[in-house]
């Protein structure tokens, strides 16, 4: 310890203070004369001050204790004290703190043997020492901070009481921290220790224990509700630590009671009276369902009741006795369930019904079918024919065979009448007949392009040329809304008759035809399932079909079909699949050798070139509609879009009937957004 240097420090103070502070000389001499010799094991002090300036007193104590003192200019006051017995260093330091406390000041120990003198009210924000349990290093008026854990009492309720016991000078402070249930005390060590002792005496758990009371007939939740209602008013003026607590355990059908022995005994007797066996014949209840269909829940509830009955009989040792009879029936017209069961099983079934009879979320599914196609066909050919020399004809591409064309032209020419005289002199006059144009008309009906015929004597040449360009851009957006886990089907198209068989009678007249109808158009079938969060799993079947044309046998259909299962987030656009098709081909029919001659060879051949390109993509986007507000928002957007289209067409009018009004959807109430209107409508129905 540094106390062996006290005498030297005091004499050094006396030597340096003779010139500037003569009035301190008696005090310094008194302190020096009252101190023990240098070789003493422990220094002792006596104090004799009368109307001494407070700053001088502080400086004297700092010199005696070999401490550096920091104090502001506002420190002022007078000190008068006289000790009758010698004081050791700790007693001397406590005397110093007591005198400062009486003057409204406190000492904050700093590093390097520095003492800081501050106002008592400002000491609580200084870096005070943090003490723990059983610490003896600080006592008296030393400023400290202590954290006290509280185990059985709420610090929120205890803190206001402790604040009333803090000194009035404002040097102390009490802060409670609810998450850890601890109290932080700041102030003089003696006050902090006194508050700690108060906390320890108050912080007792009391004679409270928990008791589990199993039930035989009643429902645990119902019994707990009744007991809570009975004890609610009677325990209003009791502290929280003395109030009884009642909790229902649905899993074991038991009631847990916490409190003192008298309270638990009272609750036990009351529970036994309430847990009496009821008449089983009249234990029936009707449950009116809000969202589910009663017929769909009957099978589920029968399975659940069977499991509950078996478990109860096994627990009671009455397996197979048939004592527990459960009956579940559905009323289709009122959408209600009629359940007859013992009370405990009835409560379990009621809980299951409440969890199943909930409003299921809906999913609005939008599909986007995009098809962009373009094609180009070019056909050029020359055919020759001679009545006597033969012919050169081609049938590739869109060429009309020259032989078939010549025969059709011959049939189309009118025939001039003739006069025939028989051997017996009879005269027969045949009238003029018109030509048959049906063959020629049928032949030309399927032709497009240019056909030029050149006739020279017995020779005829047919030159045909055609170019076809096609382009298409198709966007189909079928959409449908369905419940979660509910299959939905959407179809827009037509029924096309298809000949599947024909039976001819014995006289080969009036054949019997068998016709089936095939649906063509846009079809969407989807079953959504809402998963954890906002993910939607969808089982999708999508088809686009149309009539492509007709052959000599039957109708040709074009189909684009897709079947898959995907997972998408709410509002996310996901591609299901697609096709990118690019085709190019050429067909050449020619006369050998002659068709290979440059330039001239084109007179002896027919060429058909074809190029087609098609891009097909299918997208889908699910939107979860968890409540009426979301459903109304989607419906209003669709409704307003269709109404805007109708208003636009009505403004355009009909060219030949300009004054004819066209149908337009009625206007909706646009004063409020659809979400707000849905919320207000839901409130009116409550």
Curated annotation (Swiss-Prot):
Locate the transmembrane regions by residue number.
none
Q: Where is this region: Cap gate?
A: 414-433
What changing residue 679 to A does, per the record, is: No longer binds AspS2, the AspS2-GspD2 complex no longer forms in vivo
**Effect of gene knockout:** Severely disrupts assembly and function of T2SS-beta.
Question: Which GO cellular component does the record give, naming just one?
Answer: type II protein secretion system complex
Location of the region described as N0, contacts GspC2 in the Swiss-Prot/TrEMBL record: 41-140
Presence of keyword Lyase: no
The segment annotated N1 runs over 142-206
Q: What else is known?
A: Encoded in a type II secretion system (T2SS-beta); this strain encodes 2 T2SS but only this one (beta) is expressed under standard laboratory conditions.
Q: What is this protein called?
A: Secretin GspD 2
Query: Which source organism?
Result: Escherichia coli O78:H11 (strain H10407 / ETEC)
Q: Which gene encodes it?
A: gspD2
